[in-house]
Amino acid sequence: MERLDKRAPFTATGGIIPPEFQNIKTPCYILDEKALTENAKLLGEVAERTGCKMLLAQKAFSNYDCYPFFEPYLAGTEASGLYEARLGAEEMPGKEVHVFCAGYRADEFEELLQYADHIVFLSLIHI
């Protein structure tokens, strides 16, 4: 399978895999902070040029330790339920929290309203 991302891995280290990473025995994520920041800046530039709002899709990337890299450049987060909405509100305070869900639980909705700035409903039946 061909890689879609043509950038060299480990751009922060000049494409060289640091020795301390070469013998890692367990599966793990190694994130390139420089690449995350560059991508966040790019998203911010697109938002500024177009007037759109860029949101962090937490379903795809909920590594909240990395939210500070995105926070200056994004309008907020996107959540698919109560717990992601709370995560977005807690980890990006002052930013927007958008919620989209196929079905909302009645017993969670009041709490969800505490975190959500925007809620998307699939149909009038959800209201």
PLM region spans:
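Active-site-proximal beta-alpha core segment in soluble small-molecule metabolic enzymes
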Residues: 52-126
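Glycine-rich phosphate-binding segment of PLP-dependent enzymes
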Residues: 17-18, 39, 68
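Adenylate-forming
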Residues: 36, 126-127
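N-terminal glycine-rich anion-binding loops that anchor highly charged ligand groups
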Residues: 12-16, 42, 48-62
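Generic N-terminal amphipathic, Lys/Arg-enriched alpha-helix
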Residues: 12-29
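Acidic, low-complexity proline/glycine-rich segments
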Residues: 2-16
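Active-site mouth loops of central-metabolism enzymes
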Residues: 27-33, 98
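Alpha-helical packing segments of well-folded alpha/beta enzyme cores
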Residues: 36-39, 43
